[in-house]
């Protein structure tokens, strides 16, 4: 089963995303801040990470940089999922190392398609 780490501090988003992802057959684990997310990624080795950008403790941009700088986690795809919707926000997320960027509210069909593409591309290591 594909395990997705969802790093998000908003309980409503956690509930909605976990429900939708679980219905699609994904195993979802949650971290509620960037620091906990980096730690969990290192210990759990998820297949993919969904990363909010506006997080407490360590923001999503820095958490992504930390993940991509570590040999343990650099191969794990990171998709930014954020209320930040400007082109500059997308650029910053991609520069930090995110593999893609989705603005909230998220088109779930497009997100699921991206997850499937990343998994079938062999990035699920």
Residue ranges and their predicted role:
Residues 8, 32:
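Conserved acidic carboxylate
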Residues 86, 102-103:
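Residues at the ends of beta-strands that form strand-to-helix hinge/output surfaces
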Residues 15-23:
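Charged docking surfaces used in two-component/phosphorelay signaling
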Residues 56, 74, 86:
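The feature encodes the CheY-like receiver
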Residues 15, 106-116:
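C-terminal output helix
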Residues 44-50, 55:
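Active-site beta3 strand of CheY-like receiver
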